[in-house]
Regions:
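Flavin-dependent oxidoreductase catalytic cores
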Residues: 1-83
Length: 83
């Protein structure tokens, strides 16, 4: 819901058995997204899917509440990413 700067670099590390990442879900926050990013996306003529993450149930409820009534077509809950 709030702005997140993400984790400091390096965010990705290649190992012999695969790749590790710890991106930190960098984003401007839901209010800035609605104000600054959504108008641009609306002009694209494509389906708009908002992927939201939170630390507690209340974060998800509040973020969805703020997105309701906007031009977002779908909301995806990111409940599996520990970042």
């Amino acid at each position: 819901m709030k702005e997140r700067p993400g984790n400091p670099v390096p965010r990705v590390c290649e190992t012999p058995s695969g790749i590790l990442n710890c991106v930190g879900l960098q984003n401007p926050g839901v209010d800035a997204f609605i104000k600054d990013d959504l108008p641009f996306l609306e002009k694209s003529g494509t389906v708009i899917i908002a992927n939201i993450a939170g630390s507690a149930e209340e974060d998800y409820v509040e973020t969805v509440s703020r997105l309701n009534g906007t031009s977002v077509d779908m909301i995806e809950l990111n409940i599996s990413c520990p970042n």
